[in-house]
Amino acid sequence: MILVALALVALAVAAPPAEEPVQILRSEFNQQPEGSYQFGFETADGISRSETGDVKEALDEENKPHKVVVVRGSYSYTDKEGNPETVNYFADETGYHAEGSSIPKPARK
């Protein structure tokens, strides 16, 4: 029992110090009754994100109409080497599509 108590004390002492929470500089969200939305935020450590979603009519595999949400947005941060990175993306009935310097480009034939 003493060994268990000593092990717990050792773990508590060896634990890394808790990080301070990052301040939110800006945060907004707006949703419309029909399903469209906008949101964004920015933090004190340089992370930011913004996104919009709009409802549109699309056809499924059987050519039946249905509604989909088309999403467009971007996020930015600083990587471990100190380089700024921004990723722009959109998603619709064809899938998720993203572009940024950290995302590999498909090989061209």
UniProtKB/Swiss-Prot annotation:
Give start-end of the signal peptide: 1-14
Sorted keywords for this record are: Cuticle, Signal
Q: Which residues form the Chitin-binding type R&R domain?
A: 34-107
GO molecular function ontology, one term from the record: structural constituent of chitin-based larval cuticle
The answer, when asked if Transmembrane is one of the entry's keywords, is no
Looking up Pfam families in the UniProt record yields: Chitin_bind_4
Superkingdom of this protein's organism: Eukaryota
The protein, known as: Larval cuticle protein 1
- Which organism encodes this protein? Helicoverpa armigera
Which gene name does the record give? LCP1
